[in-house]
Amino acid sequence: MAEILSLHDAVKQFVNDGDTVALEGFTHLIPTAAGHEIIRQGKKDLTLVRMTPDLIYDQLIGAGCARKLIFSWGGNPGVGSLHRLRDAVEKQWPHALEIEEHSHADLANAYVAGASGLPFAVLRAYAGSDLPKVNPLIKSVTCPFTGEVLAAVPSVRPDVTVIHAQKADRKGNVLLWGILGVQKEAALAAKRCIVTVEEIVDDLQAPMNACVLPTWALSAVCHVPGGAHPSYAHGYTERDNRFYQAWDPIARDRETFTAWINEYIHGTADFNEFQAKLARASEAK
């Protein structure tokens, strides 16, 4: 059953050094605030999982939190590369980063398999792809019914999944809407799950076909309005396109990046203080 906790307490209690951690969101509802708190608390040796790692993963990797990344595509969407990710892979800064690359269909199916308690996922998606040449975990299996040769990949079962959502009720049930990726599957596949939300209400009033995660599947719910910034939360906040553009020069240089992390994450007590400091800096320009 989910507890209503501060984000600080949830990360302290449920994220451990050496864990496999998935921070999932697709286009919107990206759990940036939780990623910042992981950096702030100095968690390390993490295996990070994400279908489309973007800015928060660049920050986690550059801050030295990660030893491995399991992913399918990574970049600053609409802008370019993740420079801290590239520096870690190409030049081992701040230390070496192991990478395990998959296709989108592969990783989505791996989450589904994990949520179903299965050891692996099966798919057809690797016909004509070179990914099996660089990822030895992509295997071939023969269908016992048709004889067709298929691809098989290990299921993804994170120690901790972290997502951002629009609403939770006081019992810890969570409601998401808008564009969804694999948040539901990632949450159900994990041993523990932290959800940051825009608001906590008495009654979810979930519309038909909405995605509702039950309290029994979650570990903690944290009230963090705006916690998906710079991505958006459908119905609550807009995407901060300027931040995505501004991140590119910050991340390109090690000293500039380190100064930004020290000022805006280590130099703030929580995400509310981070947002206030960011707003003041923006107004001063």
Across the structure, where does each feature detected by a protein language model lie?
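Conserved alpha/beta enzyme-core scaffold
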Residues: 1-285
